[in-house]
Amino acid sequence: MTMHLNDLKPADGARTERTRVGRGIGSGLGKTCGRGHKGSFARKGGGKIKAGFEGGQTPMQRRLPKIGFRSKMARDSAEVLSYQLDKLEAGEIDFAALRAANLVPSRAKKAKIVLKGELSKKFVLKGVAATAGAKAAIEAAGGSVEE
């Protein structure tokens, strides 16, 4: 027996008919159509509530006080770690040299050297701030800090 295109049919359970709601009590999905009585889920567009909405209660983000701020000083200044300095060639280092070595972002207007790691080269810092620990490490390596 040969098979024809009109003999093809989908596998059992592969295609189901769309459930029709609101078509009488006998269907099991009449009247309220499976949505229950009242409430947001019974309404059209129901269940779509804003993030943070707590049903009319003052939401958490309004109950808690504002804290902190973003310093404008931090935006204009940059930190350079002492072990990053060690990757540069020994000698004079100023703000322009740090920027040329990509150790300082372009938005920064000033930089500060912070101690982290060890210094083995002799550096002379000019016009760049340094913490007390970084200053001591630079001087211990034979360098100096000129503000």
Swiss-Prot record:
Report biased composition (Basic and acidic residues) as residue ranges. Answer: 1-20
Q: Where is the composition biased (Gly residues)?
A: 23-33
One CC-aspect GO term: cytosolic large ribosomal subunit
Q: Which Pfam families match?
A: Ribosomal_L27A (PF00828)
Tell whether RNA-binding is among the UniProt keywords. Answer: yes
Basic residues: compositionally biased ranges: 34-47
Question: How is the quaternary structure described?
Answer: Part of the 50S ribosomal subunit.
Name of this chain's protein? Large ribosomal subunit protein uL15
List the source organism.
Xanthomonas campestris pv. campestris (strain ATCC 33913 / DSM 3586 / NCPPB 528 / LMG 568 / P 25)
